[in-house]
């Protein structure tokens, strides 16, 4: 800080500012649920329908999305994954933590925790920092297109960073918008 009390700069491990559920727009919530976990409000941390879909995809070679719920992804974000663990053991740990999270927290708290812990690349950890970094706005004021862009980044933040890979990010954003249409969160204009 300067002698007049103004901030000269910041030093941080992660550039993160947490927000509350009330600070999130319906657009960001809908984009996230439509893309990452369409049955989020219907399961208790593990979506067995999604697991069956993934298993069928593995057997047939026709993969159609992942099987991890938002709660399982939150568990991974909070506790990480040991690179030495095999995938099945890592997933089992995530399932256990996800079930515990679902017992302790409401769905609104879980989705807020998730959005506060995700990495949006370009030194933006969490939705508050990402909304500011990429769109100079707050999570409450994110449009459908902005929300879709940010949620699209979650698949691979570095690869879908709109500041670096605009074309790829725009394509991924369109995938998210199509998911929002598919699950009736938005209609065609």
Residue ranges and their predicted role:
Residues 1-27:
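Terminal hydrophobic membrane-targeting helix
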Residues 7-11, 40-42, 159:
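Short, solvent-exposed loop/turn elements at domain surfaces
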Residues 5-8, 14-15, 60, 85-86, ...:
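Mixed-charge, polar/low-complexity N-terminal
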Residues 3, 35-38, 117, 137:
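Residues immediately flanking
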């Amino acid at each position: 800080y300067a002698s007049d009390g103004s901030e000269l700069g910041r030093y941080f491990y992660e550039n993160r500012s947490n927000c509350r559920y009330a600070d999130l727009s319906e657009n960001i919530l809908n984009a996230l649920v439509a893309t990452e976990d369409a049955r989020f409000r219907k399961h208790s941390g593990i979506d067995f329908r999604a697991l069956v879909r993934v298993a069928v995809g593995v057997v047939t070679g026709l993969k159609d999305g992942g099987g991890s719920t938002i709660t399982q992804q939150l568990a991974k974000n909070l506790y990480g994954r040991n690179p030495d663990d095999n995938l099945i053991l890592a997933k089992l740990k995530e399932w256990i933590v996800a079930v515990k999270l679902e017992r302790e927290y409401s769905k609104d708290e879980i989705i807020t925790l998730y959005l506060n812990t995700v990495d949006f690349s370009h030194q933006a950890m969490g939705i508050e920092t990402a909304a500011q970094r990429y769109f100079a706005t707050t999570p409450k004021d994110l449009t459908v297109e902005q929300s879709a862009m940010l949620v699209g980044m979650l698949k691979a933040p570095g690869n879908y960073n709109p500041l670096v890979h605009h074309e790829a990010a725009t394509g991924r954003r369109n995938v998210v918008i199509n998911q929002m249409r598919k699950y009736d969160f938005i209609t065609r204009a």
